[in-house]
Amino acid sequence: MQGAQHHSSDEGHIFSEEAGLVGGPLVVLIHGSLDRSAGMLRLSRQLHDVARVLRYDRRGYAKSWPHPGPFSVAHQVEDLRGLLAGRDAVLIGHSYGGNVALAAAQSLGQQITGVTTYETPLSWFDWWPGTTAGAIGVASDVDDAAEAFMVRLIGLERWNALPERTKTERRREGEALVGELSSLRQSAPWEASLISTRVLCGYGNRGSAHHADGARWLNSNLSDSSLVCIDGAGHNAHMTHSAEFARLLVQPHLEV
């Protein structure tokens, strides 16, 4: 499989793209809420010499829009199952994408040879704060959810400076955003005791305290895990610290 792909199912299409070392170990990059596969490109390029890298737009985002849903983690695991087509893979999940990776590890078992999570939200817990970008997005109407999420994440000034085309694209993804985050707040999409895959639990020391707490919780409750901090990084470490992200949170999976 090479280049851009469109995987179709009864529920809708999923856009994906593969690059890197042909025949190398497969690494799948799973983006977070209101993001897209293009946001994982810098990290992907760090890995092209050592792995085959698959990036994809999760249902309802970017080139996988429009999509009728549902947008739960369980449905997204089925999208991932289709993209893997039986191949073994290492899964790298940024933010919400970490929940997809963990749920896939539980569902697909030995087919998943390693998992990395980075500042993955555990928003079904009572201790998870209700003032996060995700919480604000869920509390908004679908038409306004994406804008509210982005303003909370990057600030009003940066949002207003975005091109109108970009803002329009983000706003139309509000349905996917509300659908996936609402589902996540209702119940855990995986059980730590049922995940045996090695997991690297990442966070940045310039990120929010609750994201660090979430990474520590994962490390404490998964059976085979390590806690990894990227020095100087915030929530978007895959973009701002892509080399460190690859070295600390991806390459260890390829060395075993």
Each language-model region and where it sits:
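Active-site loop/oxyanion-hole signature of alpha/beta-hydrolase fold enzymes
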Residues: 42-45, 54-92, 96, 247
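Conserved catalytic-core motifs of eukaryotic protein kinase domains, centered on the activation segment
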Residues: 39-41, 64-69, 127-128, 212-213
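Glycine-rich His-Gly loop
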Residues: 29-32, 95, 204
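Conserved HGGG/HGGXW glycine-rich cap/lid loop of the alpha/beta-hydrolase fold
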Residues: 10-66
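Flexible "cap/lid" loop of the alpha/beta hydrolase fold
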Residues: 102-106, 110-140
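N-terminal cap/lid segment of alpha/beta-hydrolase-fold proteins
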Residues: 1-13
